[in-house]
Amino acid sequence: NSVYRLKEIVKVLAYYGFGFIVDSKLNGNKKSPENLRKAFEELGPTFIKIGQILSTRPDLLPLPYIKELSKLQNNVPPENFIDIENLFFEELSSTIDNTFLYFDKTPIGSASIAQVHDAILKDGRFVIVKIQRPGIAEMMKTDLSIIKKLLNITKTKFTDALIDPKEAIDELFISTTQELDFINEINNIKKFKKLNEDVKFVRTPYTIDKLCTEKIIVMEKIVGIKIDNLKKLLNEGYDLEELGKKLTLSYFKQVFQDGFFHGDPHPGNLLIRENHICYIDFGIMGTISKSLKISLNDAILAVAYHDVNKMISVIMSIGVKKGYVNRNSLYESIEYLFDNYISVSLKNIKISVMLQEIFQISKNNNIKLPKELTMLLKSTLMIEGVIARISPELSIVDVLIPYVKSQNQNLFFRNFDFDNLLLNGFKFVKSSSEFPSKFVELSESIIRGRAKIQLQHNNLQKPIKDLNRMVNRMVFAIIISSMIIGSSLILRTNIGPKLHDISIIGISGFMIAALMGFYLLISILRSGTL
C-alpha cells in the first residue's frame, strides 16, 4: 500500500508541476498556488488537512500559496455508518442505540478528519457527536512518512523558498498528532470556558465527559444564528455595531489577557444566541506566552506612537536571528512602514495587513518571528473579515489601542512585586557604586596605552578573497615580466652554457615565462573576469 501510495503522490505532484519536490528533473512549468491546491484536493483527506494546516503558516509558505490553500474545503464524502458504529463501540464498549435516545445517521458535517452528527441523550439533552474517521490516523501518518522520505532523498535545494521542507514536515507531524487526539480539543473547550466564564456575552458549549475519548467528542448543541446572517440578526432585533464591538473585545481579551485564543473564528464557528456570542469548534487554538503578550502590547504601543526604535526592540527581542541583521536596513524598513500609516486614519488600518508587512520585513532582514504569531495573523484576518461584514464602520484599531493602553496600566499594578523591586533596586545600587572605580580604571588604561578597541567586520570574506586573488595575479605578472626582461638580457649578452651558439639559460627563462603566462591566462579565463 505504501509503494502504491508513493507512486500516486509522485504522479499527482508531477502532473501539477510540483515534481521538483520529488526530483529536480521534474520541474514542470505549471507550478502555481492554484495547482498546489488542486493537487492536494486530488490526493485526498490527508493532503486537504495538510494544506489547511500550511495555510496557517505564512512563515513556511509565500503569501500567494497561503491564500490559495485557505480555499481548501472539507467537502469529504461521509463514512459508511456501519464503520462509524463499529468505531463507537470500540471506543465506549456501548452501541449508539444504547447510548442515545436519537442519533441522526446522516452527518451534518463531513470533514477530512471527522464527521459530526446530531443526537439526543437519554435525559433529553440535545448534543452533537464528533467521530473520527476510521483509519484516518494511520492514513495521515503513512502519507506524512512518505512525504518525509521523499524530501530526505530528493536533491532539490528549494532555491525559490517555496517551503522549508524539514521544518514544514516537523510542524505537520505535531499539528496532525494534536488534531487526531480529541482529548486536546476537549481540554481546549474546558480551558476556553473557564477563561471566559466571567464574560457575560460569551458562551461556550459543555462536554459530556463520560462519552468523550481520543476519537469521540460529545458536547452540548448550541442552536444559534450564524454571525454573518445579517438579515436574520436584524429581524431578531440585534444591534450589529454592538455585536462587532463585543466580538472585538472578546478577541482582544483572548489574545492580550488570556494568551489563549480561538484559532479558526470564521462565521461558521461564531453563533449568536440570546445576546451571547457562542464559540464552537475548538480543534485549532492559539497560545501566546506571558513574555510574548508583553511584547505584543509594546508593539501595539509602538504603532500607536510611531516609535520605530521600540518596534525594532520588540522584533529583536522576540525574533531569532537567521543570519546577519543590518539594523540600519531594519530601521529604514520600519520607518518606511510607519510613514505609510501616518497619513492613514486609524479606522483604515488593518492589523492583519500590518502584521503581514512586519513578518516580511523581519524575513528580509534574516529574523524569524515566533510561530505563535502565525496563528495570530490568520485568526486576526478572519476576525477582521467578520467585523467588516457585520459592522463596516467599526475599526478594530480604534478599539485595540485604548484597550492595550488600559491593559498596560492595569498590568503594572497587577504584576507589581515588592520583592523583585527590592532585588532590582539592590542590583542597581551595587552596579552604580562600582561605576566610579570602573571609570578611573578605564581612564588609566587609556593614558598608559593599554586600552584596546575591538572591531568586528561582517561579510568581508568575499571582498578580501577577491583582493588577495588580484594581488597574487599582479605579483605573478611582475615575476613573468622580470623573467622575460632577464632572459632577453642574457640572450643579448649570450652568456652561460650554449646550445647551437644560443644561451640555454636565456631560452629556459623564456620557456618558463611562457608557461607561467599561459597558466595566468587560463586562470583569468576560468574566473570569467577577463
From Swiss-Prot:
Pfam families: ABC1
InterPro entries for this protein: ABC1_dom (IPR004147), Kinase-like_dom_sf (IPR011009), UbiB_kinase (IPR050154)
Domain of life: Bacteria
Entry-linked SUPFAM superfamilies: Protein kinase-like (PK-like)
Family, similarity comment: Belongs to the protein kinase superfamily. ADCK protein kinase family.
Family annotation (PANTHER family): CHAPERONE-ACTIVITY OF BC1 COMPLEX CABC1 -RELATED, PROTEIN ACTIVITY OF BC1 COMPLEX KINASE 7, CHLOROPLASTIC
Protein name per its UniProtKB record: Uncharacterized protein in hydrogenase 1 5'region
Native organism: Clostridium pasteurianum
Organism ancestry: Bacteria, Bacillati, Bacillota, Clostridia, Eubacteriales
